[in-house]
Amino acid sequence: MAHPTEHTFADVVEVEPGIRRLTLPLPTGPRHVHCYFLQGTDGWTLVDTGLGLTETPWPEILAQLDGPVTRIFITHMHPDHVGGAEPAAEATGAPVVQGRLDYEQCERVWGSPDWPERISEWFIRHGVPTDVARELIESGHVFADFVRFAWNPTLVEAGDELDGWRIEATPGHADGHLALRRGDVLVAGDTLLTPITPAIGLYPESRPDPLGDYLDTLERIAAAAPRIAYAGHGDPVEHPATRCAEIAAHHADRLARTESALGSEPRTGFDVSHDLFGSALPPIQRRFAVAEALSHLERLVVEGRAARHEDDRGVAYTARSSGGRAF
């Protein structure tokens, strides 16, 4: 079986009996994404598909399996997980299976020509200067050409069974994020990562408190106490409950830092992103930084530690204890 940190792109390697890992390249950090083949009663389930790159050698990949791929399961609608769904389906002849909420958001983002305009306006309302907002959107939407998601997939919900695996709701990194659990094994997508932590951001049409959702997800995983979690990037998480506690502590610290950035003067998500992540970020990283700052600001509002102010000019936040003045 392969060592956790060893991978060669497009090679299919066994990580434990009945589970094989496929690692595909990404043009930006973390430079790779892991997909998984799960052996079942009628063939293999492919979990996630990488980007929709024409150079992905699906015939060579599939030739390494001792049986057909009978379904393709998508953990979430981010480009590096759903982007290759259509090419993978064409190569295998297998149906694509995706969560209902996740597919709805996938269609609104990657299937909607007005999405760049909508998210640009949203960033501007959160304090991003107009010229910077355009730059952020252009940098992030470069992936759109490589997102070939499957229209009208088979829709599933948390609690459904998929060839012996239970579908688990794991929102946070994406609202509709799903994982697969069987016995003491969790195929986690981007819910649990090591040594990095999953990005938890607020975006247009997000659920109102994605960080709160994610903290609840961590509690549920820790309570279930799986032996191992196979992640979408990096090494397998060998002590998932411990890793859940570490990530929760990381966000508690970031919440404290976010709270300390607030006072009586209204500050936007763009402002606070500089306190949390510094000023020297390329546009695509600033996009994530603003979204991450906003998820923490909204969590502080839910916890009564910050106040949210919104009018026709935009959205800003103050410390709850300061009282604050109108934006």
Language model: regions and residue ranges:
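Conserved beta-strand hairpin/beta-sheet module of binuclear metal-dependent hydrolase folds
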Residues: 9-67, 179-194
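Aromatic/hydrophobic pocket-lining residues that form the small-molecule binding cavity
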Residues: 58, 82, 214, 293
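Histidine-centered divalent metal-coordination motifs
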Residues: 75-81, 99, 171-173, 177, ...
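C-terminal regulatory/interaction regions
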Residues: 1-6, 257-327
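Active-site HxH/HxHxD metal-binding segment of metal-dependent hydrolases
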Residues: 59-157
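Metallo-beta-lactamase
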Residues: 44-53, 140-151, 166-255
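Short, contiguous alpha-helical
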Residues: 90, 170, 301
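Short Pro/Gly-enriched beta-strand edge/turn motifs at strand-loop
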Residues: 16-23, 138-145, 163-165
